[in-house]
Amino acid sequence: MQLLDGGWVYSPTDLVARMDCDHRTALDLALKAGLLPVEPGEADGMHVLAGKHGGAHERRVLELLRARHETVVEIDQPANSRAALRAAAAQTAEALAAGVDVVFQATFFDEHFRGHADFVIRGADGYEVYDTKLARSAKPGALLQLAAYSEQLERLGYPLPRQLHVWLGNDEIVSRSVDDVLPVLHRVRADLLTQLANGPVIPPRIWGDRRSACGSCHWSEVCGQGRDDDRDLSLVAGMRGDQSARLREAGLVTIEQLGAAPDSARPDTMGVATFERLRAQARLQVTQDATRTSADPVGKVTSEYFSSDGVRLLPRSSVGDVWFDMEGDPFAEGGAGLEYLFGYVTIDQDGEDNPLFTPIWAHSPQAEKAAFEQFVDAMEARLAHWPDMHIYHYANYERTALTRL
């Protein structure tokens, strides 16, 4: 959002932010209005790298389109003023009216909305909008932005595009029906406009509940610190959002309150076993937190068995066991990605006190294939020697990546 000449102007990015998290929008508004005493965090290295590779992908597609089409018009990025935005939007409208094949960085501005579409390309059915993304699939946010641009084309008098197109890093073009996305766009836009009309306010609680969008949000550090400072229930390992909401309604708002809660504090909407498990987890974490020091930031970790079923599922240890981790660069090879490290730890050489780490590096698709083959061969050899061995890994990334390879 921007305040231009006293009025709010929103962008497709703001629509995506509102779709992901209304709290983010509230903080953004308060910040722009100068109401907040805190600032959002700086972009981390991954976001900077993503922007760099995304820009390179966009320029590569531009050169590809210039080679394919006779008329490609590039609209310069306008300054942040209504006059400059009007001028850039007029240039875009003139290019479209002239029937050019491609408009790069097409500017749309209707005094309330501003946007810069990567590519507007003329096809058999008229103009349609394309967005370049290094992702391996068309994400909801990209489709929402494309739908907003498509409605801007309709506002200028052109037929509403029937398709939305995402140009992926591997040059695959994923297309989706605009009709599938417009209802979401209309709902999100109505919510955002209502929020803008109500004006900026400082939320009663600076931090927001944890959600999937936190990983890519510039407010994540502020919210995370707020949850830590207030000892929020989201700190309890394994706590779902709906569970914390039920506990808050019952008057339990901190991890300490939950850990010390009597049986009578259980919400009627929560099962006994679930309440007892979450309460025990909170109690263990409170105990650990009390033992943390500057010399020992982890503190004393304790455990409590609620059920041995999960423990029984763990296999017996084997001297041939392997602890495996992979590292990948999702932006390498034009967005196709590259698994550049296959690393594993074994203990059969010198025992558990002296584990051996074996790295297999790959810096090209050919080397990635060779590294994959080397790792699989090594595991098959170990399995032949230790039939009771297992490979341990964290989360599902390794299984998914190996299956893909």
Which role fits each region the language model picked out?
Residues 81, 93-95, 99-125, 129-197, ...:
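Conserved DEDDh/DEDDy metal-dependent 3′-5′ exonuclease domain
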Residues 167, 250, 261, 324-327, ...:
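Generic beta-strand/beta-sheet core signal
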Residues 316-374:
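Metal-dependent catalytic core segments for phosphate chemistry
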Residues 1-124:
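Metal-dependent nuclease catalytic cores that hydrolyze phosphodiester bonds in DNA/RNA
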Residues 179-246:
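Long, highly charged, low-complexity intrinsically disordered interaction regions
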Residues 279-321, 326-327:
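A contiguous, basic/glycine-rich beta-loop/short-helix subdomain that forms a polymer-engagement track
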Residues 227-295:
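Compact, charge-rich alpha-helical regulatory domains located at protein termini
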